[in-house]
Amino acid sequence: MALPSPASEEAEGPCQEANQEYQEPVCSPVPEPEPEPEPEPEPEPEPVPVPPPEPQPEPEPQPLPDPAPLPVLGFEAEPVQEPEPTPTVETRGTARGFQPPEGGFGWIVVFAATWCNGSIFGIHNSVGILYSMLLEEEKEKNRQVEFQAAWVGALAMGMIFFCSPIVSIFTDRLGCRITATTGAAVAFIGLHTSSFTSSLSLRYFTYGILFGCGCSFAFQPSLVILGHYFQRRLGLANGVVSAGSSIFSMSFPFLIKMLGDRIKLAQTFQVLSTFMFVLTLLSLTYRPLLPSSQDTPSKRGAHTLRQRFLVQFRKYFNMRVFRQRTYRIWAFGIAAAALGYFVPYVHLMKYVEDKFKEIKETWVLLVCIGATSGLGRLVSGHISDSIPGLKKIYLQVLSFLLLGLMSMMIPLCRDFGGLIVVCLFLGLCDGFFITIMAPIAFELVGPMQASQAIGYLLGMMALPMIAGPPIAGLLRNCFGNYHVAFYFAGVPPIIGAVILFFVPLMHQRMFKKEQRESSKDKMLSHDPDPNGELLPGSPTPEEPI
């Protein structure tokens, strides 16, 4: 019998009471408890935007140092020298990609350079008349004065070439404008002070040294500045400039002869100095376009005395042009020819006065030289533009051969007409030789080193140019006439022509050899230099100086 649970007893209590009252018991359902409402979730706070962290630059990987070489038994390991950093040039532009304007303001520069070449070489090519005037003044003191008087004009002409390496340094460091203006001012002072002295020894300094050095500083920048404004028509520009010298040469003999007859030698120097004064003003138009070199960090970082000396030496004397064999041969050939080049200009007038005493217009010979020189410079300018590469040198070979032969023909002329024909050929050869000198230098060493290449060339010509006329004067004193002197003057140009003949052949041979080597070693070829290119015969790329 199961016992009732306490819950059942509680349920029976109210029912029994209802039965006692005779009422039907009502059982109400127990209400279920209402579920408590779930609390609404609180809204989550909006996240505050956090700025993303700045990206940190990744450190560049440092190159591992080269392992030190293992010492070999019996030898000490030499310290490894780190290569010097590549020098940088702070300029307005680089030579690579530079395009000359080929005109425009360049034609004003051409006019200034024309006046420069015309006034300088117009005076120097008329030195034969000045030489005769000097002899007239000095004959009263010394009968055998030809040797001493010849030094005046020879020094002036020789100093133009002797100072050329120094002028190249000033041109590279200071620019064409400052160098040319300073030189023209010095030339003006030299000519003007020559009028205040009658001493031959003092005129060695005033005319020979001062005037000659000033002309050198004024002349060479006129050759270099044309390469800044012309490239495709550089030969034509050089021809126009050189032709200006011929126009002046045609007028200067007549002018100097007229001044000498009327106002004598001293006042003639004063009149000629005005041309140098005008040149000083015109030289201000030489605005350079190509960059000039400056000091590099590697040069400033030199520590040892030897390094500082080498830095300064390389800074002022760029010897890289002599690494090219073709340039060395070319410069030596022209220097050899220069020994007899200037002899006819100095002694021709005196020779004609001695042999053809009835002829008064001896200056006509210098006019003929100037006229055909201008024609030769114009023609050679056009011809050189059409001749590719170093084949232009063959024009110099031909001109030197004819120049030597014509010098030897002077004593063989029996009449004045024959001398006129000889002088016409002399001027033509002079025009061809002078005009193509700068374009050949650009072809040999490139535009960045052309300035010093021309400077060293003219410097090598200085000694034979100075020595030639005095040697001819000494021969005249020894033999009593100019025959041997002019025969002597014709030999060096012929020798120079033979030397120059081999330069294009050697250049072509070296170019083919380098092409064969470059085709084999393409993977090991040098990177292109930003300032130049590798020239045939040069071990290093062309660089600014």
From Swiss-Prot:
GO terms for biological process: amino acid import across plasma membrane; amino acid metabolic process; hormone transport; negative regulation of neural precursor cell proliferation; thyroid hormone generation; thyroid hormone metabolic process; thyroid hormone transport; thyroid-stimulating hormone secretion. Residues 29-72 are annotated as: 2 X 22 AA approximate tandem repeats. Residues 124-149, 203-204, 257-264, 350-362, 414-415, 475-483 are extracellular. The modification N-acetylalanine is found at residue 2. Its main location: membrane. Residues 514-529 have a biased composition (Basic and acidic residues). It is a multi-pass membrane protein. It catalyses: 3,3',5-triiodo-L-thyronine(out) = 3,3',5-triiodo-L-thyronine(in); 3,3',5'-triiodo-L-thyronine(out) = 3,3',5'-triiodo-L-thyronine(in); L-thyroxine(out) = L-thyroxine(in); 3,3'-diiodo-L-thyronine(out) = 3,3'-diiodo-L-thyronine(in). Residues 46-70 have a biased composition (Pro residues). InterPro entries: MFS, MFS_dom, MFS_trans_sf, Proton-linked_MCT. Belongs to the major facilitator superfamily. Monocarboxylate porter (TC 2.A.1.13) family. This is Monocarboxylate transporter 8. It comes from Rattus norvegicus.
